[in-house]
Amino acid sequence: VAQAAAPCRPFYMAIKTNMLYDLAAVPNLGAEFYLGKNFSIAANYMHAWWKNDAKNFYWRYYGADASIRWWFGKPARIKPLQGHHIGVNYQILTCDFQLGKTGLMAGMPNGNMVDRANHIVALEYGYSLPIAKRLNLDFTIAGGYHWGLFEEYEPVDGHPVWQATKRRQYFGPTKVEISLVWLIGCDNYNKDKGGKR
């Protein structure tokens, strides 16, 4: 007589990428873990380092963010990591953008990540929509406070020449996310998209 497989211990995790960053040629990858009691923790990293010195082209952006989320609504009661969520988001980032003329660099040139970083603290709201057995689309917006230094420079004889230092202190939208989410873990699949419970 065949024995039934022992039930696995439920585990809820997700790997994701923000497709808006991907469209902007900024590769990124994130992970989210369900903590229990409708709470999860998420972290993301993005890194783009494209450049062409001869054409004064720089498209460089890297940083990370982390969120603590609380999930609510009917879908969240059925299964973790789906439905509505609200949370607190923190971002640290630096960038260097130049498209032939004036360049814009976040933070202090030649500094370390802490020196060069801009920081963001924000509140976020989102909704994670099942689209396949192990896939969701997560739509998230965040708004809060962004602060840090920006350096403006011009290309002169093949070298960047400083023009101005500006301190940014900004309240408003800080993040837009449309992420493709891959669900990982025992019992972490969408019932109505090909899974069985």
Model-derived segments and spans:
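Short loop/turn motifs that connect adjacent beta-strands in outer-membrane beta-barrel proteins
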Residues: 4-11, 38, 73-83, 131-137, ...
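Gram-negative (and chloroplast) outer-membrane scaffold detector with strong preference
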Residues: 33-135
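Transmembrane beta-strands of outer-membrane beta-barrel proteins
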Residues: 16-20, 42-46, 87-91, 140-142, ...
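Structural signature of outer-membrane beta-barrel domains
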Residues: 48-50, 91-97, 144-150, 183-187
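Outer-membrane beta-barrel "beta-signal"
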Residues: 65-70, 170-197
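Transmembrane beta-strand segments that form the barrel wall of outer-membrane beta-barrel proteins
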Residues: 9-24, 40-53
